[in-house]
């Protein structure tokens, strides 16, 4: 997507030090904010393009470097040795610490003059779980989780989620079985400010144009639903 956005890497204070995040600004220069939470492949060109897309949509978008404690600014592809490396980085990453870092990113965004209004988190894969956990911790005003693996194992925190929450799942996702999706659906059933969508014929990673599992139709539909959700609640 060729869009008119300006971007830069910024420092995010955390634990007495700092880590970096990729910041993309809308053409207007300001707006509400979205934290774009990476998959296990780092803040790679795809995640930066997602941030650029949301900036083009009118949001201040920040993609924090979630793996900074293990390997700062790592960028990986989706196959072979890169995939193996990504799995190793995931195993070395403590989810609670990563969620605290998401909170630090939210705090940094709220301090930026460009940010007017609320801060949402939109996460993909591992980042989807982090978006959910950040919502449970109250560090963001809204969360969207794309194929967030492991959310079904943290449903004891669902009652702590006091903000609007949207879930996107691919019907063919072998990483997240239908029972897991059902468990999340049941836990959030009856909440006016939450929604769960399952995409037929879509697999894990369906939003990523650089992956074999990319599904353009599901990706466009989910993006539209996410924008509508942001528009309603941010």
Regions found by a protein language model. Name each.
Residues 1-234:
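N-terminal cap/leader regions of alpha/beta-hydrolase-fold enzymes
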């Amino acid at each position: 997507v060729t869009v008119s956005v300006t971007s830069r890497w910024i420092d995010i204070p955390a634990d007495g030090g700092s880590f970096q995040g990729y910041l993309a600004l809308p053409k207007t220069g300001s707006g509400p904010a979205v934290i774009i939470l990476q998959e296990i492949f780092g803040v790679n060109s795809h995640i930066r393009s997602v941030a650029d897309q949301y900036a083009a949509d009118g949001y201040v978008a920040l993609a924090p470097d979630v793996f900074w404690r293990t390997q700062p600014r790592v960028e990986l592809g989706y196959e072979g040795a890169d995939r193996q490396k990504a799995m190793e980085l995931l195993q070395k990453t403590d989810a609670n610490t990563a969620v605290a870092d998401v909170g630090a990113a939210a705090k940094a965004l709220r301090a930026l003059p460009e940010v007017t209004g609320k801060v949402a988190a939109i996460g993909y894969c591992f980042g989807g779980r982090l978006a959910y956990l950040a919502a449970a911790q109250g560090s963001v005003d809204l969360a969207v989780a794309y194929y967030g693996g492991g959310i079904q194992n943290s449903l004891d925190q669902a009652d702590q989620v006091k903000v609007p929450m949207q879930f996107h799942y691919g019907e063919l996702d072998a990483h997240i079985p239908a029972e897991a999706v059902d468990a999340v659906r049941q836990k959030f059933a009856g909440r006016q400010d939450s929604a769960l969508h399952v995409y037929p014929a879509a697999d894990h990673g369906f939003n990523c144009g650089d992956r074999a599992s990319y599904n353009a139709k599901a990706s466009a539909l989910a993006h539209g639903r996410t924008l509508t959700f942001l528009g309603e609640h941010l």
